[in-house]
Amino acid sequence: MKLDIINREKVYSRMESIPNGRASDVIIPGCLVLEGGAFRGLYTQGLLDFWMQNDINFQTVIGVSAGALSAAAYMSGQIGRSARVNLGYRHNSNYIGVKALSKAHSPIRLDFLIHDYDQIEPLDMERFHDSRRRLVVVATNCQTGPSSLKRATALILSWA
């Protein structure tokens, strides 16, 4: 599948200003909790990029919904990755909108983020699985209702 940005005239005009690079290997003891909130998560992602640029890499991260997706990029140490996909593909009907709704029964296709976009900018799985760090995601059981905490692994990411 070739991924192009649809509606090129609507591409984020400051894509080149999004930071790029890798976070250092410095790990800070402590826990960070990232809430969800769909595209409000862009603010969180910008803060995480700033922290990674300044060697603030927490040992444990708990993510809920969009916060879990932001946490995956943070744990992989990929500065700017979340902003690039969300700002670069915000007008792509394979990612968001009616076409996405018809494919994924949701206005945002999480499988696009996890599978399709990963072909363009792969998540650094070696860094993601750094044994010094821990990522926990909150998952809701759609059949029973209660939520539970799950240690994030590549397997859990592939469920989306």
Could you describe each region identified by the protein language model?
Residues 1-29, 142:
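Small-residue-rich anion-binding loops in enzyme active sites
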Residues 2, 8, 26-120, 149-160:
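Patatin-like phospholipase
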Residues 22-24, 126-129, 139:
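Short secondary-structure boundary/capping segments
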